[in-house]
Amino acid sequence: MLKTESSGERTTLRSASPHRNAYRTEFQALKSTFDKPKSDGEQKTKEGEGSQQSRGRKYGSNVNRIKNLFMQMGMEPNENAAVIAKTRGKGGHSSPQRRMKPKEFLEKTDGSVVKLESSVSERISRFDTMYDGPSYSKFTETRKMFERSVHESGQNNRYSPKKEKAGGSEPQDEWGGSKSNRGSTDSLDSLSSRTEAVSPTVSQLSAVFENTDSPSAIISEKAENNEYSVTGHYPLNLPSVTVTNLDTFGHLKDSNSWPPSNKRGVDTEDAHKSNATPVPEVASKSTSLASIPGEEIQQSKEPEDSTSNQQTPDSIDKDGPEEPCAESKAMPKSEIPSPQSQLLEDAEANLVGREAAKQQRKELAGGDFTSPDASASSCGKEVPEDSNNFDGSHVYMHSDYNVYRVRSRYNSDWGETGTEQDEEEDSDENSYYQPDMEYSEIVGLPEEEEIPANRKIKFSSAPIKVFNTYSNEDYDRRNDEVDPVAASAEYELEKRVEKLELFPVELEKDEDGLGISIIGMGVGADAGLEKLGIFVKTVTEGGAAQRDGRIQVNDQIVEVDGISLVGVTQNFAATVLRNTKGNVRFVIGREKPGQVSEVAQLISQTLEQERRQRELLEQHYAQYDADDDETGEYATDEEEDEVGPVLPGSDMAIEVFELPENEDMFSPSELDTSKLSHKFKELQIKHAVTEAEIQKLKTKLQAAENEKVRWELEKTQLQQNIEENKERMLKLESYWIEAQTLCHTVNEHLKETQSQYQALEKKYNKAKKLIKDFQQKELDFIKRQEAERKKIEDLEKAHLVEVQGLQVRIRDLEAEVFRLLKQNGTQVNNNNNIFERRTSLGEVSKGDTMENLDGKQTSCQDGLSQDLNEAVPETERLDSKALKTRAQLSVKNRRQRPSRTRLYDSVSSTDGEDSLERKNFTFNDDFSPSSTSSADLSGLGAEPKTPGLSQSLALSSDESLDMIDDEILDDGQSPKHSQCQNRAVQEWSVQQVSHWLMSLNLEQYVSEFSAQNITGEQLLQLDGNKLKALGMTASQDRAVVKKKLKEMKMSLEKARKAQEKMEKQREKLRRKEQEQMQRKSKKTEKMTSTTAEGAGEQ
């Protein structure tokens, strides 16, 4: 079995084309040649030739040549001749309706027999000169064989000059002919659907040759296509009838059991019978596989047979000169057998004699079995040759690229990768395959109780046969050794592609096609082996490829629209190119600069050969010079079959019948009457084709003349229409210019109007916004005014209630004082009570609440009625630190010595606080007021810090009472200080101005202001000089007064403006009310007048 590469070893250029399966089968056939180089290998080669390949490819003699080439690297020269002779003697099935000739003679296109220039023995001798050793390049050897076979191209069994021109350097199918030399009628057949409508004579021409060649093609193709190989890993289920048929050939293993060659059908009819009889038998009995149902196999075989029936007759004819059956039957007719042919047969007999001895030794261990069609295909050979053919043959079967291998009591030898057990079992050639013994039965489908009436199928309930399968693990797939085959075929092709410079090209396919013609280059062209690839042969002038400029002659076409063209047949490549549409994507490979391109040399030789053939055609068909052009290449050689307007009748007809290259081949000595009549018939058909085409061209010319006259009339009519349209266009253009100017002016007016409108809109929006703001402010002001009015009224009411309450309390306090004086009667107690009352009143004047005042009053009453010891807590409560802190904050660290005239400030000043503090100290030192004398108090008051206190203590009780009353009145006005400020400043009195100064902590200037009788109106007129005159020397005090005066002036101004606005609004409201009243009065007057008039009328 062939060793395969791992996926990691494959390059990105390895195509996933289905051809790999075909290559794999070919490699297996070649590998068996290496494993059994003598007998087994050669017989497997025989079977490999007949196996059906994918896409219509079949093994040809080139496969044998390549295998022989590989074998010669490790053989002796004397072995080379024998092997080549042996391989030369093998071929496909014969064509019964063709005249058979010896190997020295070759049938020409016209049916004449021409002697080969170089005989078979000469070719055999050429291989003796080949180099030995595996280091020599097999490609170089095949290249030399190809170059030598180019000179033998005139000895083809059937060819056309045009075809030879297109593929002269293609791989040679046989020893004397190339692959491109077949397929003339194939081209016509493929084009028959198109040519029927255009030129009926071409169809008739195609039918003539189909009638001549198709019977042999069908019979031979069926004979070849029914020969299969089973080479996979899955079991093959053959019916017992087939096994019996196979067993009947067991006696053929013995060379003595073969009948003599003269009994095997010498003439053509017997060969036809012997060939045709076993074919349907094998086709119907040997194709059931266990993994595939019988109906599927039959369906897969029928397309193969149908396709094989449609194969070109030329593809079969190429094997004709080398088929052994054809040779043995043609020998009686050829009266001049050459000595080279005799040498070939002797060499074959010697080789077969040695291999027959080997076979007899192998028969002890058993051998392979053979197919009936293989025995039928071996007709006409010598007895040892035929027995050798059956020595190591296999039965092969192909179905959709799936390969199966028959496993029985023996295994075929699959080369170095096989196991030792397989090699031992391969020697068992007498054992027969009995597949019925390798399956087990299981219970089938159960019987159905209710079968639907509409069912058209029936299920079998018979037991199900289960065949044993063998997994891939049974085979050794290690790649420990690399044999020579691993470096051939597809691997070599893709390796060659890797060395090319690849680039993508996209062409747009037009009505004339892609503008390129292709050619397949290589040695094994028919089987795909050692094929160089598909190359660009010519580039059509003016075509899509020439306009693009990237595709050049000798470039290799690697891919077309994602389909790989590496290692495919030329027929397949032409089909792919023909089926492309629209934008076609190519991957082109080109030789890198500096490399010697063998393809370029081959293509140049092909073009040169075409040139010579074209000259030959011109000589023989001088009357058709006008029709002989390059537009009608075949579908198998180039892609220009896509050209729609090509006349296939003329060009194709000429290309179908092509004459040989050399003039000496047409010597009258070698031409008989039948050949001349055949040639005359060809010329008649060509003449008929040409006449039909000429007649068709005449009719086309007449139609063109009529069309020309019609076009002239239309031209004059169109010119008149053009003139009229020009005049109308001029008028319309003038109208259009006028309309354009009018639109211009209208646009200008519109722009001006729009600008004015925008300006007015802006002004309107601004005015609207101002009106809304003003209305909102007016509403806010009215609301604020109402709120202020309500607040002032509430404050006045609260002050009034408070004043009344204070007056009531004053009266109560006076009554209490008189009561206390009557009780105590001493001056000291009076003075103490006076001090207490003054401090309590001072607290009231500084914002104490009514509750604190009541508390002080009750504490004073309790202190007078209780014992002296209980009076101490009262003095502690009077000497609170909160009072001291409040006094300090009110003064704000700006304490000044009071003047003696300021008697009013003696109690509220800091000195008064100090005196109170000393009095508290005296109380804390437990000095009782009763023991304190008036002299002590006077001495205490005589201290320099308390001048005001000493004066106040010296006063009489009546004077102190009057002072208390004055202080109560003054302090009662102090809560109303803010209320005084709220009044109009111009209305302030001198006392209110004094209070204002006291609120600013400027008590020292109160006496000057009161002395000068400064009222509110005068206060607003004061400036810096006047303030200095009033004794305000401190600049800070002046700045405070100026600031306050400025604020008052600003507030007065605002109030004045607000008053004016309010008066205006009131005036407006009054006017509105008056207007409404007037309107109402008018309405009432009208109503009264109307009622009066109505009453008067009544």
UniProtKB/Swiss-Prot annotation:
Subcellular locations according to the entry: Cytoplasm, Cytoskeleton; Synapse, Synaptosome
GO molecular function, a single term: actin filament binding
Oligomer and partners: Possibly exists as a homodimer, homotrimer or a homotetramer. Interacts with F-actin, protein phosphatase 1 (PP1), neurabin-2 and p70-S6K.
Domain of life, source organism: Eukaryota
Classification via SMART domains: PDZ, SAM
Coiled coil: 597-627, 670-824, 1033-1090
Domain notes per entry: Interacts with p70-S6K via its PDZ domain.
PANTHER family: NEURABIN (PTHR16154), NEURABIN-1 (PTHR16154:SF22)
Modified residues (Phosphoserine): S192, S338, S371, S460, S840, S915, S928, S956, S957, S960, S974
Positions of region (Interaction with TGN38): 597-1090
Feature: compositional bias, Low complexity: 182-195
A single GO BP: calcium-mediated signaling
Annotated spans, Actin-binding: 1-144
Protein name from the UniProt record: Neurabin-1
Sequence ranges of Basic and acidic residues compositional bias: 1-12, 33-49, 264-273, 355-365, 839-849, 1051-1078
Originating species: Homo sapiens (Human)
UniProt feature, compositional bias: Polar residues: 196-213, 855-865, 921-936
PROSITE patterns in UniProt: PDZ, SAM_DOMAIN
Annotated region (Interaction with protein phosphatase 1), positions in chain: 425-502
Compositional bias of kind Basic residues: 87-101
Keywords, sorted A to Z: Actin-binding, Coiled coil, Cytoplasm, Cytoskeleton, Developmental protein, Differentiation, Neurogenesis, Phosphoprotein, Synapse, Synaptosome
GO cellular component: actin cytoskeleton; cortical actin cytoskeleton; cytoplasm; dendrite; dendritic spine; filopodium; postsynaptic density
Keyword Cytoplasm appears in the UniProt entry: yes
Residue ranges of every copy of the SAM domain listed in the record: 988-1051
Positions of the PDZ domain: 504-592
